[in-house]
Amino acid sequence: MQKEEAKELIKSLVEKINQWNYEYYQLNKPSVSDLEYDKALLELEKLEKEHPDLILSNSPTFRIGSFASEKFTKFVYQKPMLSLAKAYNYDDINSFINNISKIVPTENINFNIEPKIDGLSIALRYKQGKLVKAATRGDGSEGEDVTENIYQIKSIPKLINYFNDLEVRGEVFITKNDFKKINESNNFANARNAASGTLRQLDANIVAERNLSAFLYEIVEPEKHGIYYQHEALEFMKNLDFPTNPFSKVVEIEELEESISDFAEIKNKLDYDADGLVIKLNDLQMWDKLGKTSKFPKHSIAFKYDVEVASSRITDILTSVGRTGKITYIANILPVLLNQTTVKAATLHNHNFIKDMNININDEVNIIKAGEIIPKVISLKEEKNYVDYYKKATNCPSCGSQLVEFEGIVDQFCTNDECPDKNINNIYHFASRNCLNIVGLGLSTVKDFYPKFIKNIKDIFDLHKYRAELIKLPRYRDLKVDNILNSIESAKNKKFSKVIFALGIKHIGQRAAKLIADNYANFAELLDDHNLLKLQNTKNIGPKIIESLIEFISSPANQDLLAFLDAIFNYEGKAKVISTILSGYTFVITGVLSEPRSHFVKLIEEHSGNVSSAISSKTSYLLAGSDAGSKLEKAYKTGTKVINEEQFYDLIKQ
């Protein structure tokens, strides 16, 4: 695009989006859909990135929300009330995770997710346990004081059993049922407009009549209240009788895709409008460290669902089996265009879904592609007035074994340890990028090598014995095979936590694997800990994880595998514990010391201490060398004890 053309387009988009913002925030009468607005804003952001010299001073990319209305007293925020960046597909989510992982170790990353309510953002301030101020977001720096109107919302507590100064933030909305009642005598375009218009009424009696609802989701400066994780913040608010969203939950990185996909199915069944899913880094201590742009924090993102739905006819229904043995039903459909891609198959999840939806071959069904991840059937195009659903599978599609069902679980399972598809998927998971990252050993390669050269995880490490045969296979030459074999050899130096995660044990994601590895140096130590007593006293390790791990290590075959892995792996970076003198202490290391940082990390871990990258309220000591810089300044400001090398050595000699 020529520069003049870009200049004109930027000017046009700025004018158009600013007008839409005025209609949305001030008039509560949007003239375009969220999708059209988002696409225009994305186009403007792209153009401004390509032509930074053409950015206009009134560009909406710099503004959060809208200016506060003149009808209300202004409310100035000490901490800006930012909006959230948006993700439209899983590539956007991956970029978000990758940016976080530049600051936060991957194994320490998990997320709190909750529905993105289509309402009006608010902040509530409490002093001595009493609600004293309430405001709308406005432009993020300055909002509208709507305290009297907030007092009319029944679910928001006016008095709380907590007497420190507290600011919480959330969303005011109107349920679908209440919106229907309101619109019997009004003409609001949607529930969001009704909520916004109601909260900005000058007559508080009207607010009381319209029965607004609210969910609270954030505590400002949580560390002042001894809160360090988002799930703790929600629990804290819930215990003070603040309304919090019951769909909020903590998920690991590897669970995000499924969670996004699952929410697409239920969001329209909720009694309020939810136009997306908010994904927040659970570790609040890292929020400030990750920073923000002028509009968005980098610790959170809002996943927006494209509402495009396609219809097609089911030509066949098949089953597949994953690495855990879980059976998934898949609908083959007549090819249909959805989100600019041709879709030929869509998931039906499990047989309960098929039965509940009354779905069979030859039915016309509606399909979505949730976040451009997994196409899925969501409903029949037209309901049938008779019962006609596809029969339940009885045998595994891979090995033919009888399928098993467990009480309280809707899925069916193949429990045959020799099932080819289960084993192939297990081997692939073990070698995948987030596990041992064995380059070249992808799914198609595992299928090529199975079962002649690889039948299980142990066989991966014997592949070198078959090099002469492997290089004779179609598509496998010397260099390709050697790269795989070299990558297998390198994998033997991975962290213990990576190996734990690679085993694919139920309920054990990357974060749980890291917590397990923090307690044990190898599998032998883990097996020696009767009933996993160490883990039972470990924060964020729940009974489901312990139960699943005990079940896994109780199998003689798995015990044999774990002993084998211990024998061939030289686990990276795990210090052998020689004393507990530093147990319960957290160190931050900064400046130039007489030995490399790794030397001191090893010593701290050997004596049962922890090492952190940033000073927080949990930091016990700052070990400082010369040229310590900003961390030393922060330590003095926060009252963190500062020690030098000599004092550190004195500590571990005690």
From Swiss-Prot:
**Signal peptide segment:** none
By its UniProt entry, which InterPro entries does this protein fall under?
Answer: BRCT_dom, BRCT_dom_sf, DisA/LigA_HHH, DNA_ligase, DNA_ligase_AS, DNAligase_adenylation, DNAligase_N, NA-bd_OB-fold
Q: Which domain of life is it from?
A: Bacteria
Q: Where does NAD(+) bind?
A: 34-38, 83-84, 114, 137, 171, 280, 304
- What are the coiled-coil residue ranges? none
Protease keyword on record:
no
Give the required cofactors.
Mg(2+); Mn(2+)
Which is one GO molecular function term here? metal ion binding
Q: Which SUPFAM superfamilies match?
A: BRCT domain, DNA ligase/mRNA capping enzyme, catalytic domain, Nucleic acid-binding proteins, RuvA domain 2-like
Q: What does this protein do?
A: DNA ligase that catalyzes the formation of phosphodiester linkages between 5'-phosphoryl and 3'-hydroxyl groups in double-stranded DNA using NAD as a coenzyme and as the energy source for the reaction. It is essential for DNA replication and repair of damaged DNA.
Protein name (Swiss-Prot/TrEMBL): DNA ligase
Task: Tell me the organism.
Answer: Mycoplasmopsis agalactiae (strain NCTC 10123 / CIP 59.7 / PG2) (Mycoplasma agalactiae)
Gene expressing this chain: ligA
